[in-house]
Amino acid sequence: LMKTGLFNKVTMTIQPENSDNPNVRDLLVEVDESQTGSLNFGLMAGSDSGLIGNISLSQRNFDVADWPESWSEFWQRKAFVGAGQQFSMEFQPGDEVFNYGASLTDPRFLDSDYSLGGSVGWMSRDYNDYRQETLYSKVSVGRKFGDIWYGRLSLSADRIKLTHFDDNVPVEIFNDQGPSTINSLGISVSRTTLAPYTRPTEGSRINMSIDQYGVPSGDYTFTKTYISTTSYFAIDRDFLHRTYALRLDSKIGYIFGGESPTFEKFYLGGRSFRGFDYRSISPKGTPRVAGGDPDVSIGGDWEFYLGAQYEFPVLDKFISMVVFCDSGTVVDKPSFDEYRVSVGTGIRLYIPQLGQAPLAFDFGFPIVKEETDKKKI
């Protein structure tokens, strides 16, 4: 019930034995319903995406069939609520990223164990040497298996165009300018045992996916596989019941069975590999013009990553420090060539008014790198 996000508190009490049926006990469930709808205005800043404004409307207890009977019912927020569906709309203008989209998901479609969801939107992303514009849509069907396993089948249809090239754009990216139709059919499986669910210190999360591109049609045909794991270990607890936790991460991705465009390949760097510039860990392209930059990343078909992070409290439950080590590579074929390693430290600020995710400030320093790598502390 807590994982639905619809309740602040859930209390379960086993009722006294009934003499008429001594082998059965009733269970009293008391819930404190949370505020499920929100209209948010915000400003986000990140090392990978620049400055982004955010205007979002969300409802975690949406009902697409509950149409208002009057305008007053609509403005009093008594319509479109009550079925447990999840609806959101976002408008995100930024200096590097511009996105607007909408999504609707029914986690228990027709009161079954299956979920049904869809999303549509448009996004523009400015890279150093070009711009990528994506018109995207996705439909997915999912199902829970027990308490920890979840499977999903999804169909995606995207229209991608690369524009605003400068002289440093390599041949490989320029040839992918499109517009390109990118369709895919994907299957994903996840297993989650994180505890507690919102700020885990124990348990693990495993995600596995395989996507076949070119289904039912499209400009590219290839297969993309990906596996990621995250594990938490509670190392110690102090007298204030604060936890010292170790986090281990791994990622393996492989593209095969055809030629993939540069915008679907793997990259590491920035938040995904601290101490290196965003998307800088990757094979480099061929300069398109004389004097062009020979060190522009074009992505690889093989990604391997291992990371470790130790987090310990500093001030109550609101401020903590981390030390970390990131390692991995992105190349064209499965191997450990051009392997990089970085170490660093950071701070986490947990501010409940800003959501469950902390403000993160990390400082990474490469200790194993290639000559052409671009560092970013």
Predicted feature residues:
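Active/binding-pocket-proximal capping segment
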Residues: 121, 321-330, 338-342, 364-365
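Edge/loop elements at the starts and ends of beta-strands within beta-rich repeat scaffolds
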Residues: 3, 34, 48, 80-81, ...
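Class II aminoacyl-tRNA synthetase catalytic cores and aaRS-like
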Residues: 127, 365-374
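Outer-membrane beta-barrel "beta-signal"
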Residues: 57, 186, 344-354, 374-377
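Periplasmic polypeptide-binding modules associated with outer-membrane biogenesis and secretion
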Residues: 1-46, 69-97, 101-106, 132, ...
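Repeated loop/turn-to-beta-strand initiation elements of outer-membrane beta-barrel proteins
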Residues: 7-10, 37-39, 50, 61-68, ...
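Transmembrane beta-barrel wall of Gram-negative outer-membrane proteins
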Residues: 93-177
